[in-house]
Amino acid sequence: MTTIVSVRRNGHIVIGGDGQATLGNTIMKNNVKKVRTLYNDTVIAGFAGGTADAFTLFELFEKKLQIHQGRFVKSAVELAKDWRTDRMLRRLEALLAVADKNTSLIITGNADVIQPESDVIAIGSGGPYAQSAARALLENTDLCARDIVRKSLQISGDICLYSNHFFSFEELIHENKDII
């Protein structure tokens, strides 16, 4: 699996992920880029699960964004519905963490579209470790979103066998948000 973390703070939205790809219990590659920008760089997304499956889902989500003219939540719900009902898509094994300037979501193959209660999302095998670290850092430090994501990924990479310390990041800035 992997670790993907998303944090919102002071108008900055960052999604970061580790780079490890495994096949069974063997590390196949250390520098996979699991985060991407979509829809003219207005959406950021990260995946946990099968790489080919995730790229398929990225493409489908971007098509939904185009069809629905960038309406983020509507596009996520429509993707989840298709994922659940289409016989071929149902076989895809991945989770997506996606964000635009206003909203962060987790999209699953069970037709779940989940908006977190807090400003943190973490998915993948290292997700629980990263989420715990990110929440603690968000609540108890003044670190920026990117530094929180980086430190959370480092902690997860130290604990989770299926995560490493090669990180990639994507960031959005909410221009209308007052940065304190």
Swiss-Prot record:
PROSITE patterns: PROTEASOME_BETA_2. One of its GO terms (cellular component) is proteasome core complex. The active site is at 2. It is an enzyme of class 3 (hydrolase). Signal peptide: none annotated. It catalyses: ATP-dependent cleavage of peptide bonds with broad specificity. It holds the Pfam family Proteasome. Its main location: cytoplasm. GO terms for molecular function: metal ion binding; threonine-type endopeptidase activity. It is found in: Cytoplasm. Keywords: Allosteric enzyme, Cytoplasm, Hydrolase, Metal-binding, Protease, Sodium, Threonine protease. A double ring-shaped homohexamer of HslV is capped on each side by a ring-shaped HslU homohexamer. The assembly of the HslU/HslV complex is dependent on binding of ATP. Belongs to the peptidase T1B family. HslV subfamily. PANTHER family: ATP-DEPENDENT PROTEASE SUBUNIT HSLV, METALLOPROTEASE TLDD. This is ATP-dependent protease subunit HslV. It comes from Wigglesworthia glossinidia brevipalpis.
